Amino acid sequence: MPTIQQLIRQERELLKRKTKSPALKGCPQRRGVCTRVYTTTPKKPNSALRKVARVRLTSGFEVTAYIPGIGHNLQEHSVVMIRGGRVKDLPGVRYHIIRGTLDTAGVKDRKQGRSKYGAKRPKPGEAAATGKKK
């Protein structure tokens, strides 16, 4: 344990926190271009075909980003916006593509949690047309 005199001479060094999303370089979102759009399988207890894209960012990084929601219109050379946020059952996927911005279309027919998927508010007449009631 250092003495008070030693602490006066040289204060304690603060521990540096390692970022979970280094490719964003401290920004909330980053723009990038899809270099490859494909599906991959999740870790052990789960089973699915998860939609992911390899994205070349403006920060110079190339990262793997998850495409949330049902259905998407992304292909190679699509310009996308990504945010931080990992996918627990996909190793190496630490970013999410933001739906409804740039070349990424919002999720069609989304009624709840629309803001997370870039879906517009349905018109009052459309709710009755689908035959769904609360």
Swiss-Prot record:
GO annotations of cellular component type: small ribosomal subunit
Reported function: With S4 and S5 plays an important role in translational accuracy. Interacts with and stabilizes bases of the 16S rRNA that are involved in tRNA selection in the A site and with the mRNA backbone. Located at the interface of the 30S and 50S subunits, it traverses the body of the 30S subunit contacting proteins on the other side and probably holding the rRNA structure together. The combined cluster of proteins S8, S12 and S17 appears to hold together the shoulder and platform of the 30S subunit.
Species of the source: Thermosynechococcus vestitus (strain NIES-2133 / IAM M-273 / BP-1)
GO BP terms in the entry: translation
Lineage, uppermost ranks: Bacteria, Bacillati, Cyanobacteriota, Cyanophyceae, Acaryochloridales
Region annotation Disordered: where it falls in the sequence: 103-134
SUPFAM superfamilies xref list: Nucleic acid-binding proteins (SSF50249)
Domain of life (superkingdom): Bacteria
UniProt keyword Lyase, yes or no: no
Location of 3-methylthioaspartic acid modifications: 89
Protein known as: Small ribosomal subunit protein uS12
Gene this protein is translated from: rpsL
Presence of the UniProt keyword RNA-binding in the record: yes
CDD domains assigned to the protein according to its UniProt record, in alphabetical order: Ribosomal_S12
